[in-house]
Amino acid sequence: MPRTPPYPEIVADLGALLGLSRPAGQCFAAIWRAARPPCADDLTAGLGLSRSNVSTALKELRDWGLIARARAPGDRKDYFTAPANPWEIVRLLLSGRQRRTIA
């Protein structure tokens, strides 16, 4: 039986079909499934991506409206959250794709 690819890789492939970069798809999957909002350092360590790849991916995800920044009291780091509703995510992906197709 073939091994199922890890969840971030599946989301990265789906995101690439809609115009997201692979690192953005991986970061989104990690943010969406995280028990607590991760920071960029958490994503770098957990996904094995470079800090610059993660930073670029986070900017791309913010531009698409797929993630939001959050701050923890007393902490200077930015943490990231994603919509919990899968239908909201689909809506954001499709509207982002449409904006990029028309532009």
Protein language model regions, located:
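Key DNA-contact positions within bacterial/archaeal DNA-binding proteins
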Residues: 52
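Glycine-centered, phosphate/nucleic-acid-interacting loop/turn motifs that mediate DNA/RNA or nucleotide
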Residues: 65
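Short beta-strand "wing" residues that participate in macromolecule-binding interfaces
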Residues: 69
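A short acidic, leucine-rich amphipathic alpha-helix
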Residues: 42-48, 61
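Short, Lys/Arg-enriched N-terminal segment that forms or immediately precedes the first helix
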Residues: 3-17
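Pre-recognition alpha-helix immediately N-terminal to the DNA-recognition helix
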Residues: 26-29
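Short acidic, hydrophobic short linear motifs in intrinsically disordered regions
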Residues: 36-42
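Short, cationic-aromatic polyanion-contact patches
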Residues: 17-23, 39, 72-93
